[in-house]
Amino acid sequence: MTYSIRIADLPLTERPRERLLSLGAQSLSNAELLAILLATGQGKGKLSAVGLGQHILKELSQHKRDPLDVLRDMSPQELMNIPGIGPAKATTILAAIELGKRAFQLRPMEKVEINDPVSAVAALSHDLMWQNQERFAIVLLNVKNQIIGTKLISIGTATETLVHPREIFREVLKQGATKLIIGHNHPSGNVAPSQEDIDLTEQLLKAATFLNFPLLDHLILGNGNHQSLRTVTDLWIRYPQEG
């Protein structure tokens, strides 16, 4: 398949819209999903919609980051610098990205029970998942592990955030919570815990044990990924928490 073949000239089984209808959106490549948003290519004899989608991804791959990660942060003007992308195409792409963010970041209703890292990630996503600066937030729980609320504690730089145990447990007391989950984001999308993350978690587990407010997990979020320190460290074995 070449970039200049029109979608209308493709067999039905190879057209992005038809493939989405028959196989589901998850079966399409990134270029095919972009092609559906673009609707048209660059015109006769030039790139088709799929070809233009491939060209966009190729251009963005020069940033040494995942092309979709780059695309997520682009402004309309930056998108329109790519040949073949005008205001209509740029705004359609960015509207789709924003809608996806909002769907992913929906807050759970209060009193939802947190029983695994995934449900806690859903509670923290609005504040942490797609942010360009490091942020630290907490999920406040009652005795039944139901959400009382979430609270953004601090906002740092692109690479670090500063938080003190006093700020965290003050909020726990203020909201009448009995347990908590803490979380922060890595804007890079690499959710592997750093030594600083591990050290902070140990410090907070000691404080939680002393104050009798069980700390159930420390989650790292970023660009659609997440990691639970409870599952990848032995800290909760060394500092057992009720609940």
From Swiss-Prot:
This is UPF0758 protein PCC7424_2073. SUPFAM superfamilies: RuvA domain 2-like (SSF47781). PANTHER family: DNA REPAIR PROTEIN RADC (PTHR30471), UPF0758 PROTEIN YEES-RELATED (PTHR30471:SF3). Pfam families: RadC, UPF0758_N. InterPro entries: MPN (IPR037518), RadC_JAB (IPR025657), RuvA_2-like (IPR010994), UPF0758 (IPR001405), UPF0758_CS (IPR020891), UPF0758_N (IPR046778). Residues 112-235 form the MPN domain. The lineage of its organism: Bacteria, Bacillati, Cyanobacteriota, Cyanophyceae, Oscillatoriophycideae. It comes from the Bacteria. GO terms for molecular function: metal ion binding; metallopeptidase activity. A motif (JAMM motif) lies at residues 184-197.
